[in-house]
Amino acid sequence: MAAARLSHRMGRLLEKAPALGPWTRVYSTSPAFAEVLRLPQKQLTKVVYPLRELGQHLAADSGPGLIEQRLFDPSLEDIGRAESIFEATARNRIEYLSSAVRLDHAPSLQQPEVCFIGRSNVGKSSLIKALFSLAPDVEVRISKKPGHTKKMNFFKVGKHFTLVDMPGYGYRAPEDFVDMVETYLKERNNLKRTFLLVDSVVGITKLDNIAIEMCEEFALPYVMILTKIDKSSKGYLLKQVLQIQKFVNTQTQGCFPQLFPISAVTNSGVHLLKCFIADITGSLK
């Protein structure tokens, strides 16, 4: 039984995201990303490819390649294509659908789904607001008080995919959090990837470990996002990223090997994350 379970878990891990298609024609992108493309090269790398920028600060004896697990390394053209998927237009409606406290209350949808989980005050709502910055009519509420999100909130991104904002775990979490989240993660058939947010300033906490164990137990393909990278010095952030990367490499089986450092304040890493989401949901085909 254990061997079969491990085999199933590894099978889920080895599922590959759809390959990015070749740049065969000119695609339009958002004016905001067009401005990013005009940045000087060093600043452009920092905003679009923060992991690559961090890797440039590694000493030669710091373990080459440890930080640069860049399995997903799209071109600027591919990122530009993905940017347009997150831009609300008459033909690409991006909207809040509904909220639910139980899976049987959730909207029944066939399109691919991704969900975001993390402890209270990790910056989840701020990140989702940044992802939807090109959809000004979509309201993502941000509160200074941890634990503001109490339900599963469903957002539809055109005909491409649905994004689900889960309640935060830990401080002021809903009483039925475990039943709500576990049931969703185990039984939502169209769930393509779970994004687990970790505060880059604090690192992986005991509560985060519980969430990681849950993802591993359910054999879920998941991705670790490091939030608030603007809050630390370069040296401290690099130390944190190296520690978390080592944890992912040695202590997990279902976690995508590449970390995604993010700042919802400076937008660093947000464009790359949009492209990754568009890729794994098949939206770039």
Swiss-Prot record:
GO CC list: mitochondrion
Residues annotated as domain EngB-type G: 110-283
Binding site for GTP: 118-125, 147-151, 165-168, 227-230, 262-264
Residues annotated as binding Mg(2+): 125, 149
Gene3D superfamilies named among the record's database cross-references: P-loop containing nucleotide triphosphate hydrolases
Keywords: GTP-binding, Magnesium, Metal-binding, Nucleotide-binding
Required cofactor names: Mg(2+)
An example molecular function term from Gene Ontology annotations: GTP binding
Family: Belongs to the TRAFAC class TrmE-Era-EngA-EngB-Septin-like GTPase superfamily. EngB GTPase family.
NCBIfam families cross-referenced by the UniProt entry: GTPase_YsxC
Official protein name in the record: GTP-binding protein 8
